[in-house]
Amino acid sequence: MNSLVTFILPVYNAESTIYRCLDSILKQTYCDYEVIIVDDGSIDNSGKICDSYSLRDNRFRVVHTENAGVASARQLGVSLATGEYVIHIDSDDWIESNMLSDMMNEISDADILVSDYYYNTKHGQTYVRQVDCTTSEELLDKIIKGEVFGSLWHKLIRRNLYQNIEFNTDLTFCEDQLLLFKILTTYQCKVINLHKAYYHYECNDGSITQRTDREYFDNKIKYEDYALRVLSPLSFRYIRDIFVLDRLKSYSGPIQSKIYSNSEIKALVNRLPKPNVSMIRLKFVFVNQILFFIQILKAPVVIKKILVKVFRIIKVL
């Protein structure tokens, strides 16, 4: 008997894309799956569309809730899942018909399978290859370095890894990456890669990750604070230090757009722990130095002083 796989699908006002998403699940050649659809208070026809699929196929289950955000929707989906494995899918994305079949043929005794994926924009489609990993620490390291994407949607994960681990429901994005950090710092997982792409990640101009307003950066900072706590144990200090350096360079957005006041930017910098750069690869630090020089050249005088202080933190001694 084949193992059951659970799809978790949060939906909010997705009537323009949900048909394509649900049809791609329906076309899976691997038939032993269930779909937990959490309609997060949609005010368009998304909920009705999802209901129509549940009437057609009893593997589709729809739960309608008041709007509480994507993290709450994912958490509810996980709590209702009964499959041995779990994979997430977003309502504006879609998957190839052989995805589950190939993944289930490969996963064997592994805990997490990471596949490649397609990055789709209005300009075309790009194949994105993920770096090989075999352990929790390797996967965590590669995600923070940007060599593996941190989302859950191209990762098949054993459901028991979700036990006693919850999404941070006050996050509006990066909730899946933070959840993955928690799994990888809690369990010693066997990880394998499947170098085929099945998931089509649709990047559109209206997505929350394309925003640059204060709400976006506030959420990003909140995520960073949570992530630093997850990475605080001594055994993950090296990875945490890389995360700190990467976060420092990400402050270019609020600096250039003047979303935060000078005092707020200074507070952002000061709240980060000082990384031990002697443990970090010279190449990684050098890239961050170059990015800071660019920021310093463009920034106002007051911000220059703050950035120079930051640069001294990451300077190779």
Regions found by a protein language model. Give the residues of each.
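Conserved donor NDP-sugar-binding/catalytic core segment of glycosyltransferases
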Residues: 98-127
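Membrane-interface aromatic/basic loop that binds lipid-linked glycans or pyrophosphate carriers
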Residues: 255-317
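N-proximal low-complexity "stem/linker" segments adjacent to membrane-targeting elements
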Residues: 1-24
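Conserved nucleotide-sugar donor-binding catalytic segment
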Residues: 139-214
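Short aromatic/hydrophobic "clamp" motif used to bind/position activated sugar donors
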Residues: 86
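Short, acidic, metal-binding catalytic loop of nucleotide-sugar glycosyltransferases
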Residues: 23-32
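Glycine-rich, basic loop-to-helix element that forms the pyrophosphate-binding segment
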Residues: 65-81
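A conserved acidic beta->alpha catalytic loop
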Residues: 24, 39-49, 90
